[in-house]
Curated annotation (Swiss-Prot):
Keywords: Aminoacyl-tRNA synthetase, ATP-binding, Cytoplasm, Ligase, Metal-binding, Nucleotide-binding, Protein biosynthesis, RNA-binding, tRNA-binding, Zinc. PANTHER family: THREONINE--TRNA LIGASE, CHLOROPLASTIC_MITOCHONDRIAL 2, THREONINE-TRNA LIGASE. Catalyzes the attachment of threonine to tRNA(Thr) in a two-step reaction: L-threonine is first activated by ATP to form Thr-AMP and then transferred to the acceptor end of tRNA(Thr). Also edits incorrectly charged L-seryl-tRNA(Thr). GO terms for cellular component: cytoplasm. This is Threonine--tRNA ligase. The gene is thrS. Residues 247-544 are annotated as: Catalytic. Binds 1 zinc ion per subunit. Belongs to the class-II aminoacyl-tRNA synthetase family. Zn(2+) binds at residues 344, 395, 521.
Length: 648
């Protein structure tokens, strides 16, 4: 029999018969490893233990201690177990797809009656029964005709449609546990009993169109979460409870920041308090960008399709664009325009005005670019997923030898912004060359080395995301971690030689000839709308004092203090503090509760004693203790707190 060579993570190699399974390989190492093994990564792909290996490859055996692979298997198996449970309870239900998603899975069902929240408990109970049966998981490869005949006979039209969409040369794998069977690529555990029965929970029911097409059947989607142990599930559910308390939509109402309405889906109606946050943040970013050497520009909202065709967006991005047809002076054909979904092609137009020399590079442009992108209504989410948004967009035109310095400077800039906004920790994901790419290997080598050297120069840890770069260049993604451990991808840095070529951007080099510049796309916040949502949730509404829309409320205890309240407010405002008076005929405890719900950072109470002594009683949000301060001292202290960090 033919032999194959398998290379293990420690670099050692061993010979095996071709067709050996990952389970056999684990058993050859030790009996204990075979008992603990759940799957294997072979040649970079994840397989179950029954998968035969026919060629030389790298191999890593996984156990439940390998969290990434274990979570994938547990969640994948639970998707199948849930579908089986549903069909055992309601046999007439038709199954469709059930992928693994972040923290869990979902499965879409076609059922005449709607699932109720009470049904989730029934399904969970049945799932635990299936887990306790410890049914072996087995797999077979079927030909297309047999698979279609099977699903047609069982009245599963969605599976037939899925099979017809699979390329003809791709094998069709069928997985069973018990008598229940599903079409699936795998991998899966060896029996249902390997799934932790106390570490999953069904979460919610939603509607979903088949294939995401509103003209197709409306299905019912059941979501679940799962982990490798009950303590991890408990921690996740606690985090979800905390996230619900921090939901920016809830806090947005309580703080009177914004609202959304059906007449303008995905567009934000900013109220004065919310707009104060927005403009304060924008002013801060404007100063930071200027200090980093960027020139601010502004480009049109409505742009003719010709530019989008030239840039390539018309072909690749049109479904996300808002198209505007204009009857130009009763011309034979209407002019076709689009609301810009991004700013980069317009920035190239500015670069192309006038001759550019190598001495002009790097040339840095920044724009608070207002963009519009179509998102399905079901994907919209408060101010975090919208159709109209503003980016802190920037583009640098430079030579190849300038990329490293520009990248390092941006990482330093981004780090200082995140720190000022209360995010001490972020992760850099370095996406490298994909399999399908343009450009020479030498150019890719140089550019990837430039980005890696830049990251190392700044001292930030990073993770390689191999093969996930764009077809024309590598990129960096920056992920923030918030106060409850959630990750948010906000910042980006993308190397792009493609768009300057498509839009014919050139500069005159030292040799007197024309050369193409590299275009570096970068954003720090991403969009103001989404980032403000993240800020609200990260801080639970207790924004940094300098960003808070209502920084201080001065509240009267007695009506005789009203004039002094106004005097205090005037003095604070003169010191740059956003201060308001509350002289309503209400009890002070009522005023404190109301303004605390509105997340006002500081409340100054003023009564007869404060009027006489020219003092205030200071209470900070979330604290029970108060302190009596002189008006001059509190004005000076709060004036400093109200100053943006870049101006201190």
């Amino acid at each position: 029999m033919a032999q194959i060579s398998l290379t293990f993570p420690d670099g050692s190699t061993r010979e095996f018969d071709a067709g050996v399974t990952a389970g056999d390989v684990a058993a050859s190492i030790s009996t204990s490893l075979r008992k603990k093994a759940i799957s294997a990564t072979v040649g970079g792909a994840h397989y179950d233990l029954a998968w035969p290996i026919h060629a030389d490859a790298t191999i890593a055996i996984h156990t439940m201690q390998d969290e990434e692979q274990a979570n994938e298997l547990v969640r994948h198996d639970l998707a199948h177990i849930m579908a089986r449970a549903v069909q055992e309870i309601w046999p007439e239900t038709k199954v469709t797809i059930g992928p693994v998603i972040k923290d869990g899975w979902y499965y879409d069902f076609d059922r005449a009656e709607a699932f109720s929240p009470e049904d989730l408990g029934l399904i969970e109970k049945k799932m635990k029964e299936i887990i306790n049966k410890r049914d072996p998981v087995r797999t077979e490869v079927w030909d297309r005709a047999r698979a279609i005949a099977h699903y047609e006979a069982n009245d599963e039209p969605y599976k037939v449609e899925l099979i017809n969409a699979i390329p003809g040369d791709e094998p069709l794998r069928m997985y069973w546990h018990g008598d229940w069977q599903d079409l699936c690529r795998g991998p899966h555990l060896q029996h249902t009993g390997q799934v932790p029965g106390d570490a999953f929970k069904l979460m919610s029911i939603a509607g979903a169109y088949w294939r995401g097409d509103s003209d197709r059947a409306m299905l019912q989607r059941i979501y679940g979460v799962a982990f490798t142990g009950k303590e991890k599930l408990k921690a996740h559910l606690t985090m979800l409870e905390e996230a619900a308390k921090r939901d920016h939509r809830k806090l947005g109402r309580e703080m009177d920041l914004f609202h959304m309405q059906e007449e303008a889906p995905g567009q934000v109606f900013w109220h004065p308090n919310g707009w104060s946050i927005y403009t304060t943040l924008q002013d801060y970013m404007r100063r930071k960008q200027r200090a980093a050497g960027y020139q601010e520009v502004n480009t049109p909202q409505v742009v003719d399709r010709k530019l989008w065709e030239a840039s390539g967006h018309w072909d690749k991005y049109q479904e996300h664009m808002f198209i505007v047809e204009v009857d130009e002076d009763h011309a034979r054909e209407k002019a076709v325009n689009a609301l810009k979904p991004m700013n980069c092609p317009c920035h190239v137009q500015i670069f192309n005005q006038g001759l550019k020399s190598y001495r002009d590079l790097p040339l840095r442009m920044a724009e608070f670019g207002s963009c519009n992108r179509y998102e399905p209504s079901g994907a919209l989410h408060g101010i975090m997923r919208v159709r109209g948004f503003t980016q802190d967009d920037g583009h640098t035109f430079c030579r190849e030898d300038q990329i490293e310095a520009e990248c390092a400077a941006f990482i330093t800039y981004l780090s200082s912004v995140y720190q000022d906004l209360g995010f001490e920790k972020f992760e850099i994901m370095f996406a490298t060359r994909p399999e399908k790419r343009v450009g020479s290997e030498e150019s890719w080598d140089h550019v990837e080395a430039a980005l890696e050297n830049a990251i190392k120069a700044t001292g930030h840890p990073y993770t390689l995301d191999e093969g996930e770069g764009a077809f024309y260049g590598p990129k960096l993604d920056f992920k923030l971690t918030d106060a409850i451990g959630r990750e948010w991808q906000c910042g980006t840095f993308q190397v792009d030689p493609n768009l300057p070529e498509r839009l014919d951007a050139t500069y005159i080099g030292q040799d007197g000839a024309k050369h193409r510049p590299y275009m570096l796309h970068r954003a720090c916040l991403g969009s103001f709308e989404r980032f403000i949502g993240i800020l609200i949730e990260n801080s639970a509404g207790k924004l940094p004092f300098w960003l808070a829309p209502r920084q201080v409320v001065v509240a009267s205890i007695i009506s005789d203090a009203d004039d002094y309240v106004l005097e205090v407010v005037e003095k604070l405002q003169a010191a740059g503090v956003r201060a308001e008076a509350d002289v309503r005929n209400e009890k002070i405890n009522y005023k404190v509760r109301e303004h605390s719900v509105g997340k006002v950072p500081v409340i100054l109470a003023v009564g007869a004693r404060e009027v006489e002594e020219k003092t205030v009683t200071l209470r900070r949000l979330g604290e029970k203790k108060t302190s009596v301060e002189t008006l001059d001292a509190v004005t000076q202290a709060l004036g400093r707190e109200a100053t943006p960090p870049d101006l201190l």
